[in-house]
Regions:
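Proline- and Ser/Thr-rich low-complexity, intrinsically disordered segments
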Residues: 1-175
């Protein structure tokens, strides 16, 4: 409608200029009173104000896992006290909020906490890094004559061992 200007507001918080500031004012019933002109009495109308809090998805985080580690709860990696019941998205499908480094991909996983209108959804991310365990190769053997030239121990390992490891044994190994 078209209420008469110049009325007064009353309610749970002081109204200045007919404006409600959800950051500083309380929710509740606000009453607008339009003054009457004799012999007509003043009339009132009300506005019920609901103020929804925005969702809190937590704060961004990161985790580094080994591909042989057990599954980890992504929700526990969010900072703060995030709202429960949100949804996960990322490079792999997240089931039950868990990431299994043996079967899922590294990357950025997004947690979305649903907002209650008119508050929008909010998101936080977890950056997941998945490292592979070192590969020392498989056991090997070598038989040498004491007059043979030096031989590479690394070449005696089976499989595809990672370079750059360290050696230990009954004698110092150089190189």
């Amino acid at each position: 409608g078209t209420p008469d200007a110049g009325g007064t507001w009353s309610g749970p918080s002081a109204v200045i200029g007919g404006l409600i500031d959800p950051a500083t004012m309380s929710a509740g019933v606000y009453t607008y009173t339009a003054a009457g002109t004799t012999p007509c009495p003043g009339e009132t109308a009300t506005v019920t104000v609901t103020i929804n809090a925005p969702p809190f998805p937590g704060t961004d985080g990161s985790i580094t896992l080994c591909s042989t580690d057990a599954a980890v709860d992504l929700f526990a990696q969010l900072g703060g006290t995030p709202d429960a019941g949100g949804t996960w998205s990322g490079p792999s499908s997240v089931v039950g909020g868990m990431i299994d480094p043996a079967t899922m991909s590294a990357g950025v996983y997004t947690y979305t906490a649903a907002g209650t209108a008119p508050c929008p959804d909010e998101t936080a991310t977890i950056t997941v890094t998945i490292n592979t365990p070192p590969d020392p190769g498989t056991d090997g053997t070598i038989t040498l004559c004491s007059t043979d030239a030096a031989a590479s121990l690394f070449a005696q390992l089976g499989g595809t061992p990672d370079a750059g490891g360290t050696w230990s044994g009954p004698s110092a190994v150089v190189g």
